[in-house]
């Protein structure tokens, strides 16, 4: 019989239970605040590891991008097919101040608009806003039947598509260049630009389901705390000193 180590006796230490530590004890919660251009500013909560040593929690939070449904921000189910991206730019206590970072459509909404017997027209432009944000905006539109039309389809010719795409690009460029990022966001929510495109292209070919389907942020200017505070409705009031009345200097006779 070979003499050696008994493997069964050496298994005792492996069966010891390890101390279970709840990972959430090392984390803390922060409230996400949307800009004042939206009706509901309370987006939700996010967590991050607590500040320890040289690692600061605010450094891990800055630049974090969250995706929110526009229906939750506006309190209306009419905007349920839009997704808005918000970027954390500043940490104030337990509040995270965000800025607009982009917008997109849900996949089911896009697929529901694509149908037979019509032409899909897409256009995109890269423009800089008046406050130096570089955006790439994608627009989508579909043709519809003309009044008293007998034909089943409403296909547009290539010349019509080029003319419509040119008009859409011109309108998008003009609206973005003459607006700040906050003003542009307020125009995208009620779809003001869509109605302008529909009126401008009705002489070329009648359109329907015109939407700015996507907004992508390509470049942003240098971070300005004052502009972010104004966007969140904070720090807009000027702090002015008041004139003091009834004050007399006291002269001491002896020092």
Swiss-Prot record:
The modification N-acetylalanine is found at residue 2. Pfam families: Ribosomal_S3Ae. GO terms for biological process: cytoplasmic translation; maturation of SSU-rRNA from tricistronic rRNA transcript (SSU-rRNA, 5.8S rRNA, LSU-rRNA). The keyword S-adenosyl-L-methionine does not apply. Belongs to the eukaryotic ribosomal protein eS1 family. This is Small ribosomal subunit protein eS1B. It comes from Saccharomyces cerevisiae (strain ATCC 204508 / S288c) (Baker's yeast). It comes from the Eukaryota. The modification Phosphoserine is found at residue 245. It is found in: Cytoplasm. There is a cross-link at residue 248 (Glycyl lysine isopeptide (Lys-Gly) (interchain with G-Cter in ubiquitin)). Present with 107000 molecules/cell in log phase SD medium. There are 2 genes for eS1 in yeast. The keyword Repressor does not apply. Component of the ribosome, a large ribonucleoprotein complex responsible for the synthesis of proteins in the cell. The small ribosomal subunit (SSU) binds messenger RNAs (mRNAs) and translates the encoded message by selecting cognate aminoacyl-transfer RNA (tRNA) molecules. The large subunit (LSU) contains the ribosomal catalytic site termed the peptidyl transferase center (PTC), which catalyzes the formation of peptide bonds, thereby polymerizing the amino acids delivered by tRNAs into a polypeptide chain. The modification Phosphothreonine is found at residue 254. Its main location: cytoplasm. Keywords: Acetylation, Cytoplasm, Isopeptide bond, Phosphoprotein, Ribonucleoprotein, Ribosomal protein, Ubl conjugation.
């Amino acid at each position: 019989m070979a003499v050696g180590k008994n493997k069964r006796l050496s298994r005792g230490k492996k069966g010891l239970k390890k101390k279970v530590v709840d990972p959430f004890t090392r984390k803390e919660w922060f409230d996400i605040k949307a800009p004042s251009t939206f009706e509901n500013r309370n987006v939700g909560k996010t967590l991050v590891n607590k500040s320890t040593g040289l690692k600061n929690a605010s450094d891990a939070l800055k630049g974090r991008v969250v995706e929110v449904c526009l229906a939750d921000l506006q309190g209306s189910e009419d905007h349920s097919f839009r997704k808005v991206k918000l970027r954390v730019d500043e940490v104030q206590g337990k509040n995270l101040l965000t800025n607009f970072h982009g917008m997109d459509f849900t996949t089911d909404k896009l697929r529901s608009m694509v149908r037979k017997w019509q032409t899909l027209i897409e256009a995109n432009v890269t423009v800089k806003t008046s406050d130096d944000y570089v955006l790439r905006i994608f627009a989508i539109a579909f043709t519809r039947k003309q009044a008293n039309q007998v034909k089943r389809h409403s296909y547009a010719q290539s010349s019509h598509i080029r003319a419509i795409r040119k008009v859409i690009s011109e309108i998008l460029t003009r609206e973005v260049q003459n607006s700040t990022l906050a003003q542009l966001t307020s125009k995208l929510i009620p779809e003001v630009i869509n109605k302008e495109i529909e009126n401008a292209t009705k002489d070329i070919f009648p359109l329907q389901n015109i939407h700015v389907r996507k907004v992508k942020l390509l470049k942003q200017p240098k971070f300005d705390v004052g502009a972010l505070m104004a966007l969140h409705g904070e720090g807009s009031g000027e702090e002015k000193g008041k004139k003091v009345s009834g004050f007399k200097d006291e002269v001491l006779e002896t020092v």
